[in-house]
């Protein structure tokens, strides 16, 4: 595959369709990455439109800054995490915005750089931090957490059925030598996994440790809990997820905003007086076309959900 294609943002047409209602408004790309989605959004904004791009990875910020140079008067790039969006916007004296986008997938400069430690396909340090400012690495988790906690991580963040066996083997191996490389971790997983199931098990375990290292699900939930108050009426929320744990959080959150009633089903009418705050724009999850998957294989597991503030 052409290297440039690895930086191609996913579901671009769908993002634009659901996100931009007011081209003169203020939009947030909470997962700036290399600036792919932001570039497409900025191309469609009017002169009064603005975009705030947020990322906590210095490499991503530098790549995005270069890519978005032509729009420097309309884009503001901030280092931070979307979980802190309220504070980030408040620092810019912004109360509400017209649209927020999150693309929760890994960028190629995470996956393809062995030194970042995100992939089992090459040997590198067990890092997995999205931000170098974070103190705890994947090696710290695998070397210090208890066997029961490791099993919990593999099961709950990776949905891995062999969670206990893998955790037990991690602990056994680290008693001999501290786990510091992806090769060590990969060999441990392989040692307790049938050959035919190794790829999926490796993917699940690496996902689990990455989520634990970066607090990804906690950050997503924190963002969701504040997102409603940051959106103007008729503003849009668009989220692209890449695994079932993220998608489940988003789906359940949107369902609660669309139908917040807590009354017992046997009551003939609502008495709790809780009103919907959002309207679903995607009744079914939006996935990439066959053509897009052919061009960008990493788009194949992407799922988009969108809603409008009411």
Per-region residue spans from a language model:
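S-adenosyl-L-methionine-dependent methyltransferase catalytic core, i.e., the SAM/SAH-binding region
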Residues: 1-310
